[in-house]
Amino acid sequence: MKNNRVTHIKLFSTNGAGVKNGKVASLNAEVQSTQSNIVTLQETHCTQKGKIKMDKTFVMFEAIRKRKGGGTLVAIHEDLNPKLIAEYDEEFELLVVEVDTADTSIRVISGYGPHKNWEEEKHLPFFIALETEIEKAELAGKSVLIELEANSKLGPNYISKDPHNITPNGTLLAGIIERHTLVVGNGSDRCVGTITRKKSNKK
């Protein structure tokens, strides 16, 4: 067991939209620059595990989509004693990894959820699995830190500057937030950022 006197965690998370070639070098540079000890990636597009290489002090966990696209990765510095709790990789990708700090244990959840244009019945399994893992963490007395590409827009009720209205996926996610009294980081005053990409869906 590594020294678990780690008192602070620093998270680096992004939707990679395909993490390969130059993006891997950029990822490692960002992690080193920010001194992050937890990394989550959504939409890795990897077809097999082990393609994304990071510093050997990180323990890597991946869920790979059976068909093209998707995928999620969690990388944890070894000093946080990471251990895999759950991995889903059938119709969607979800990883649950537990870490230990000096004061508490946290379950880091990373996932890539259903597209809004999927059939309605294909949306529910992802959100059911997500809520199940939150409930398991609560029963075990663990905190949760959740980073998702859930293809869910929560709207201005949760994120004050969100220019979008809540979507059906967002409604499912909002139900989980309310039932478990979760805090939406993007809606916090501490969260700042710039929109770097906009997509127009023409009818």
Label each region the model flagged.
Residues M1-K203:
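A shared catalytic/ligand-binding motif for oxyanion handling
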